[in-house]
């Protein structure tokens, strides 16, 4: 599948499922163009607010950087000092932002599907960009992952991609398995069986990491999401690393052309050996870099939808 020129216009971006293949590829194309230095002048001043109700470094700060690069006005929001602490609902918070003239709200929230009430509201005019909804979806992370893969291989068709780790609790995994399958990749899963659900079988086969490490083009590691587990009393970092992580021994068995990805933050010496985070096959830092450019593309598409 190739990328062709095309203008992407979006009202909201809340899941990967709402995007057509053409829109996905168009956003990747714009991300690559921004990375190459392309400039864009918006037709007016647009205002964005980043509302993060869960901790974030990369998503939060890369959206801020994307907004700055597009010369958008940023309306500060800190959940710790907002009226949320007085009992204000998320819907009323966003209704307020809309009334103030905020054009785009980037939101991360622990509630899965939090965005549904917002995009269905007849009075909220601001566009919603989902920065992660609990263990639901993470579309902007998925798009930066796709951009990173496309830069490397120039296609998705026929690529063998393994998603390895804490799959059940990962919004990144859910977004990626759906879109990568749709774009023609062959998906495999690896990791503890207790963190895997049968519903994922429609996308790919669950195997031991040692059975797939030599054949995959992309090894996409996932963070162990301790904060979403009921209890980690029996969890051992050493055991996880030995059974499911990317060790130096497994790294040596990867194909010469294979790449290693991780959405970060990385639990070093758990999902991946500390020595491998910046190894030659690792694209973890590039993913972070691409996050700025693909989020510029997302914001531009939202602006296009308002023109």
Curated annotation (Swiss-Prot):
L-aspartate binds at residues 86, 171, 223. It comes from the Bacteria. GO terms for cellular component: cytosol. InterPro entries: Asp/Orn_carbamoyltranf_P-bd, Asp/Orn_carbamoylTrfase, Asp/Orn_carbamoylTrfase_sf, Asp_carbamoyltransf, Asp_carbamoyltransf_Asp/Orn-bd. GO terms for molecular function: amino acid binding; aspartate carbamoyltransferase activity. Heterododecamer (2C3:3R2) of six catalytic PyrB chains organized as two trimers (C3), and six regulatory PyrI chains organized as three dimers (R2). PANTHER family: ASPARTATE CARBAMOYLTRANSFERASE, ORNITHINE CARBAMOYLTRANSFERASE, MITOCHONDRIAL. This is Aspartate carbamoyltransferase catalytic subunit. It comes from Streptococcus suis (strain 05ZYH33). The gene is pyrB.
């Amino acid at each position: 599948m190739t990328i062709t020129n095309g203008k992407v216009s979006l009202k909201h971006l809340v899941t990967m499922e709402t995007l057509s293949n053409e829109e996905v590829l168009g956003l990747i194309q714009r991300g690559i163009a921004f990375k190459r230095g392309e400039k864009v002048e918006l037709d007016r001043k647009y205002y964005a607010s980043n509302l993060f109700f869960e901790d974030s470094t990369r998503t939060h700060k890369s959206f801020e950087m994307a907004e700055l690069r597009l010369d958008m006005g940023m309306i500060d929001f800190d959940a710790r000092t907002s009226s949320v602490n007085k009992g204000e609902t998320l819907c009323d918070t966003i209704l307020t932002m809309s009334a103030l003239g905020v054009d785009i709200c980037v939101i991360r929230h622990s509630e899965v599907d939090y965005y549904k009430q917002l995009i269905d509201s007849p009075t909220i005019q601001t566009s919603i960009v989902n920065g992660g909804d609990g263990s639901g979806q993470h579309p902007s992370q998925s798009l930066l992952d796709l951009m990173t893969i496309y830069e490397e291989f120039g296609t998705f068709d026929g690529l063998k991609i393994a998603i390895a780790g804490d799959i059940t609790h990962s919004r990144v995994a859910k977004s990626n398995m759906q879109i990568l399958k749709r774009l023609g990749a062959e998906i495999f899963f690896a990791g503890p069986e207790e963190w895997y659900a049968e519903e994922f079988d429609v996308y790919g086969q669950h195997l031991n990491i040692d059975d797939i490490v030599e054949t995959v083009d992309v090894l996409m590691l996932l963070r162990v999401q301790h904060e979403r587990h009921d209890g980690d009393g029996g969890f051992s970092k050493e055991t996880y690393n030995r059974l499911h992580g990317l060790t130096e021994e497994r790294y040596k068995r990867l194909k010469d052309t294979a790449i290693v990805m991780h959405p970060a933050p990385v639990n070093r010496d758990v999902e991946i050996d500390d020595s491998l985070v910046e190894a030659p096959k690792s694209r973890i830092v590039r993913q972070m870099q691409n996050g700025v450019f693909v989020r510029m593309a997302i914001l531009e598409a939202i602006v296009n939808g308002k023109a």
